[in-house]
Amino acid sequence: MDYRPSDSSGTDDDLPPSHQGRYQRNARPTGNGRPSVLNSAPLSRVHNEMETQIHLIEQEAYSSILRAFKAQSDAITWEKESLITELRKELRVSDEEHRELLSRVNADEMIRRIREWRKANSLQSSVPQLVHDAPSPAVSGSRKKQKTSQSIASLAMGPPSPSLHPSMQPSSSALRRGGPPPGPKTKKPKTSMQYPSTGIAGRPQAGALTNEPGESGSYDPLVGRKVWTKWPDDNQYYEAVITDYNPVEGRHALVYDINSANETWEWVNLKEISPGDIRWEGEDPGISRKGGHPGQGRGTKTMARGGPASNAGGRGRGSMRMQQPKTQNGIGKKALGEIEILHTETLLKEVEKVFGSVNPNPAEVEKAKRVLRDHELALMDAIAKLEEISDGESGNI
């Protein structure tokens, strides 16, 4: 291209013409000479991906809460249901997503294992109660007759309280004979503690002991201790566990053959026992009567099973002598020795004393009095039957 000769005047007219076809008029060049044209498509894609990730996190949080609730219990309470509803709003979980997440939680392997473990655990916990409640054929008849006397027995003195911690409750194997004190390896039946199945008020069974704590309810450091006491019948030591304490009477509950079919118990004033008649596992607390001769403090009274002892001093082992050969079913017929029955009025005074501190309902007190009178009649009837059995067996000798 030819240009006119420059006259070198130094003006702009002397410069060659510029070519402006390379860039658009409105384009703004960047530092590298290229226009910055922003594309909105990549930004929209990134935004959608972030929203998706956020919602996934929300679903994971919602699913975790469902798993936690299912792990706690299969039944959802109203409080949890309300909380789940609020979380669905806050975490933007739709109904369809809720159903899908709930289905995943129910199918989760860990939740399934927890559910099976909970079901098996509940079955195991219910089995011991069923065993305790199932009476054996040999004694089912006597237990039916004992219900009335057992319900009132706890009003006066109450059975020993099962307030022991599970670790303090000795098992049946732990109560087998052969402990520190001398004596036979196996204990013969405590005949003075056993009653025939003829209607005499029997001791509360294991189920009653578990569900009906004693009236004393006072803590004593001796509760849970294991002792061996000597019986005057055979001069042998027998193992027992202290399970309760009555501070009003100053008596401790001694349970023999605990958690077994032969379980028996009595209320005892340990201070009235000669040191030679009681031995302790571990350190001797030193509360037994100092001095005296063996057997001191035992007395000749009889304890009504499940009820209070008589007002005479001494232990709950009475002077009953009921030693007879066992029958074919293993339950021996007892011969009558000597039975003392606590007067009904005395029991009524004990009941009034117990209820007086808690302002009982007068109707309930009257009901208790009626049952106590029935209790006495049942005892008298049982004694008459025992005399008949004794006379019949004496004639066969």
From Swiss-Prot:
It is found in: Nucleus. The modification Phosphoserine is found at S390. Residues 50-137 form the ENT domain. InterPro entries: Agenet_dom_plant, EMSY-LIKE_plant, ENT_dom, ENT_dom-like_sf. One of its GO terms (molecular function) is chromatin binding. GO terms for cellular component: nucleus. Residues 1-40, 122-221, 284-330 are annotated as: Disordered. This is Protein EMSY-LIKE 3. It comes from Arabidopsis thaliana (Mouse-ear cress).
